[in-house]
Structures are given as C-alpha cells and as structure tokens.
Amino acid sequence: MIKQIGRFFRAFIFIMPLSLTSCESKIDRNRIWIVGTNATYPPFEYVDAQGEVVGFDIDLAKAISEKLGKQLEVREFAFDALILNLKKHRIDAILAGMSITPSRQKEIALLPYYGDEVQELMVVSKRSLETPVLPLTQYSSVAVQTGTFQEHYLLSQPGICVRSFDSTLEVIMEVRYGKSPVAVLEPSVGRVVLKDFPNLVATRLELPPECWVLGCGLGVAKDRPEEIQTIQQAITDLKSEGVIQSLTKKWQLSEVAYE
C-alpha cells in the first residue's frame, strides 16, 4: 500500500532537497548503477515520513539493479537537470516518471516501462470545474511542475499564464491557497494527490493527438548502446515475471477517477 502522501508532504516541508550522495568521487561503474531521480512526484518517487526516498520508480530501480548484478545508488536532481546529467554521464539512468516525448527522444534513449499513450492531463482546483474544462486562457494563472511534459505543453499554448514550481507540493499549495485557480498534473500523480486533498476537484484536459505521449520511459544515454540493450532486457524480463505488474498494484497506479 502507498504510504500516506500527506506524510510525504509533511516530510518534504521539513527536509531540505535530498542529495543521496556526497561529493563526487571515483566510483566503480561496473559495480554500481547510478540512477537519477526527482523525489517530488508521488507515487513514482517521493520522500516519506522517515526521510527515505520511496516509490514505484525506486522499487523498479532496485529490481533492475538486481538484474544487472550491480549495487543501486540513487541521486537527486531538479527534474529539468536530469537529462543534462545523464548526457554528461554523471548518472547511468533516469527513473523519474518521465514521459516519453519526441523532444526527449531526440536527446536520450527512453525505454518504456509503464503506461500506454497519455491522451489527457488532469486539471485540479479547489473550486468546481466545468466539464469539459474551460480554456486555460480564461484563468488568471495555471500552476505546473517545472521540466515536466505538462509544463512544456502549457508553454506551447499561446495566452496561458503559466506559473512553474519545483515540486508537486508547491503546485498543490499554489492552488490550495488560491494563488492560482487551477493546476495541471499528470493523471496518475493527480490521482494520488486527490486522495490526500479531498477538498480539491479535478477534470480532464484532452490533448490533441500530436501532443500525446507514450507512457513513462527509463532514460539512458544514446551513446551507450550496450547499456540500452541490457537494461531493455531487464525491463522485458521484469514484465514477463510479473514484477512490474506487482509494483503497479503496490503503488496503486491504476485508472484515474475524476470528480
């Protein structure tokens, strides 16, 4: 079962952005698999009440590292810094609930591991929302997390006043305290948020076909073809063994329920 996301939010308020490694040092990359994440995105990854980074992606990283025969090391970055650090080989992979988009595929290899096509986003507010949702240009501002697909989509739409924040917590607080009338979230994340903040309501924002994304992908540097092949095989094996399905149930990544 998912730990209470409210505990995640409370923990996040009192814990400084977490770095799971000390200063850079020589590391045996044949023995240690370094995964970059951004622990502000429940249920994929977040900081629990004990200050530990947990979530669907973290459990998956552990399972993949076992397949690779390596020790797992998780490093924390701002979401929009993950791709750069991967391309510079400071990390071996990205597991951060990262949507597979054409623009990201131009920069890194993204290996699908969860979800099908995402054809909609979730609009969240503390006030009643019309269905279908009003054009976002009619709201004074729209809150969204920095570096995410949904931010990229909103910024591509003319006339929307976008307010970007580093974490899901900040996005929700922006709406909860009325600074922005609505926020836009990825549906599986929004589903968890709604459980912990029942005073919020949500509706669908359908995406045009050219903006659909292909689920979540594990990022690997394009110039590491052998790693891509090895990790892809590990993901395939974990799917066939039912491990990923089991983790999906554990972290309640299922159909989003809208009000």
UniProtKB/Swiss-Prot annotation:
Q: What else is known?
A: This protein, although well conserved among chlamydial species, shows species-specific immunogenicity.
What's the protein called, per UniProt?
Probable ABC transporter arginine-binding protein ArtJ
Where the protein is mainly located, per its record? secreted
Give the signal peptide, or none: 1-25
- Transmembrane segment boundaries: none
- The UniProt record gives the binding positions of L-arginine as 38, 45, 96-97, 99, 104, 149
The subcellular location is: Secreted; Cell surface
